[in-house]
């Protein structure tokens, strides 16, 4: 590898540390504390401490290092990852009988993310600010207001973008991980026998000694791997190799050292279970550590917020959510977006969660069920891709599937015990999002079917207009067309009421493919239907934003002369009324909310 390539890899790896690992990197704030908090009847005694440490270590190895970094990240769609991407890959070569099942599983996984995203910022920030109570117990009543204040500021700056502060994420998170390592190593040196927990025999002894209780305790152990989906979801931003390098060189060693450092502290002083993370530090370092922890949790929250923006955009592009306003906060980076309605719904939800649960330990009961549910679904979809798309041998896929579920299912089952103590929250939010996505997709499908069944066929209508032409006016008219073989409703409406047509008519259809990017060579397909009618189909990936100037440029390059200032745009607001369904008034063609429509709104004529 050349020197320049090494420098580029180092830079991207550092950036990945700042974005990808924020959630899983702040888990040491609360994981071991929740494992030994007494909620499972397990005290901070040596067998339990070493057992939990062994479980945490081997979960990091098996789930993160093996499952996600070694297997799941192989499944990319032009370099992109994430649960909806995995769903698209799984359905490409699946049998028609299984395709609807795989789509439902993918949508459930995406819905789980919406459920968990409300908890992550609240849990992370509260865990950091709770360090105040160690410095001055009298400050304990201010933890909730301060947590709300920090998150209010974070959500308020979203509309301005995070390009400037984003440059600080990597050095702050690198400092955070180095601090984790130093604090943990300092404690391990004082009590090195804690390293015995690297032996998986301690995990087996833990199950043997605590039996049924140990199973439910897995619900707390799983807190160590929350955020693991970010490794796969952010693959398109940073690439596989930088994410893997960051994990094995920086993140994994730092996490292991810190967890084992907390364990060494607890072996010497079980009373430190009140907050083992902050008690690792000397008293003089508590305030700097509190500030650093707060910054790290804010960065972790930012990564989650950006993730939900990206997932929402992908769902909108793929037709699973209504078109909504998406603001690009950076002219250079297309991935930096802001969705106002999602931002403020998420903010209100997070504030309600903080004020309702009041302490991170209470919130921990709601944490993990959506993460483990997504892990199970990821395993199913990945094995489907391996079998149907990569044609791995059946015996190999079956063995891998059994191995993955042997880890994922117990973790998910252990978290089901949290349903009545807070786990209902992410499940309820996920159920709402799943209902919205499936209802929207279903109604959109029915609208397309109605348009095909009852709309005027394109070719006969054009032939009739050419044979008996109405009055023509100078210029070009672009009619947005949802269905390529049907005359747009806006054109019929214009012809009926105005009795005229422009001298050139372009029927434009925007098509979103299930890939992140479409090559420019395939961007525009032009077909001349008659001397005055053209059909243009513009294809985009779900990560791209339709651009009318670009479409016109491609049309000009292929011989169809188009000038923006001499063109009028017509759109129809179509809706399907479902009288017996709760979302009866849903409008399925909110053109004004689409990015392309926003760019041409000043020259458009909404009709119908």
UniProtKB/Swiss-Prot annotation:
It is a multi-pass membrane protein. Its main location: membrane. It comes from the Bacteria. Pfam families: K_trans, K_trans_C. The chain crosses the membrane at residues 9-29, 46-66, 99-119, 137-157, 165-185, 213-233, 247-267, 285-305, 337-357, 363-383, 396-416, 419-439. GO terms for molecular function: potassium ion transmembrane transporter activity; symporter activity. GO terms for cellular component: plasma membrane. It catalyses: K(+)(in) + H(+)(in) = K(+)(out) + H(+)(out). It is found in: Cell inner membrane. Keywords: Cell inner membrane, Cell membrane, Ion transport, Membrane, Potassium, Potassium transport, Symport, Transmembrane, Transmembrane helix, Transport. HAMAP family: Kup. NCBIfam families: kup, PRK10745.1. Belongs to the HAK/KUP transporter (TC 2.A.72) family. Transport of potassium into the cell. Likely operates as a K(+):H(+) symporter. This is Probable potassium transport system protein Kup. It comes from Aeromonas salmonicida (strain A449).
């Amino acid at each position: 590898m050349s020197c320049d390539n090494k420098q580029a890899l180092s830079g991207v790896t550092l950036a990945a540390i700042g974005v990808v690992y924020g959630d899983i990197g702040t888990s040491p704030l609360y994981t071991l504390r929740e494992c030994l908090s007494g909620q499972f009847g397990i005290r901070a005694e040596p067998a339990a401490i070493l057992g939990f440490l062994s479980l945490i270590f081997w979960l990091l190895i098996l789930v993160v290092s093996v499952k996600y970094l070694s297997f799941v990240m192989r499944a990319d769609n032009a370099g992109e990852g994430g649960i909806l991407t995995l769903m698209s890959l799984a359905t490409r070569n699946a049998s028609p009988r299984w395709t609807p099942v795989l789509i439902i599983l993918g949508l459930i996984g995406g819905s789980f993310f919406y459920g968990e995203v409300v908890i992550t910022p609240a849990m992370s920030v509260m865990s950091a600010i709770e360090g105040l109570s160690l410095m001055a117990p009298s400050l304990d009543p201010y933890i909730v207001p301060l947590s709300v204040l920090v998150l209010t500021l974070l959500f308020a700056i979203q509309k301005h973008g995070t390009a400037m502060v984003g440059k600080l994420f990597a050095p702050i998170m690198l400092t955070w991980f180095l601090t984790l390592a130093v604090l943990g190593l300092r404690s391990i040196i004082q009590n090195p026998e804690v390293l015995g927990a690297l032996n998986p025999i301690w995990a087996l002894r833990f199950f043997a000694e605590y039996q049924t209780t140990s199973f439910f305790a897995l619900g707390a152990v799983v807190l160590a791997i929350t955020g693991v989906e970010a490794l796969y979801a952010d693959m398109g931003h940073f690439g596989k190799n930088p994410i893997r390098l960051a994990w094995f060189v920086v993140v994994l060693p730092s996490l292991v050292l810190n967890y084992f450092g907390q364990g060494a502290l607890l072996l010497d002083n079980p009373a430190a279970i009140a907050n083992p993370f902050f008690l690792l530090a000397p008293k003089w370092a508590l305030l700097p550590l509190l500030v650093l922890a707060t910054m790290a949790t804010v960065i972790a929250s930012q990564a989650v917020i950006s993730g939900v923006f990206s997932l929402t955009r992908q769902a909108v592009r793929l037709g699973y959510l209504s078109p909504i306003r998406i603001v690009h906060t950076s002219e250079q980076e297309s991935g930096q977006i802001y969705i106002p309605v999602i931002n403020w719904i998420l903010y209100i939800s997070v504030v309600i969660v903080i004020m309702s649960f009041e302490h991170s330990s209470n919130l921990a009961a709601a944490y993990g069920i959506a993460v483990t549910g997504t892990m199970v679904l990821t395993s199913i979809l990945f094995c489907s891709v391996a079998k149907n798309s990569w044609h791995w041998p059946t015996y190999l896929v079956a063995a891998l599937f059994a191995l993955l579920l042997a880890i994922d299912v117990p973790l998910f089952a252990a978290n089901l015990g949290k349903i009545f103590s807070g786990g209902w929250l992410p499940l309820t939010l996920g159920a709402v999002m799943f209902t919205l996505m499936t209802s929207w997709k279903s109604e959109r499908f029915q609208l397309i079917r109605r348009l095909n069944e009852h709309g005027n066929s394109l070719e006969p209508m054009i032939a009739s207009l050419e044979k008996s032409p109405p009055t023509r006016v100078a210029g070009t008219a672009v009619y947005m067309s949802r269905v390529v073989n049907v005359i747009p409703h806006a054109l019929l409406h214009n012809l009926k009421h105005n009795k005229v047509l422009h001298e050139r008519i372009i029927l434009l259809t925007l098509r979103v493919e299930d890939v992140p990017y479409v090559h420019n060579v395939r961007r525009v397909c032009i077909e001349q239907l008659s001397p005055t009618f053209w059909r243009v189909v513009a294809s985009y990936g779900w990560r791209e934003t339709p651009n009318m100037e670009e479409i016109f440029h491609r049309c000009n390059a292929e011989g169809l002369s188009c000038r923006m200032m001499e063109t009028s745009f017509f759109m129809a607001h179509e809706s399907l009324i479902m009288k017996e369904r709760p979302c009866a008034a849903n409008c399925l063609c909110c053109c004004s909310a689409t990015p392309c429509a926003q760019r041409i709104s000043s020259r458009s004529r909404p009709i119908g």
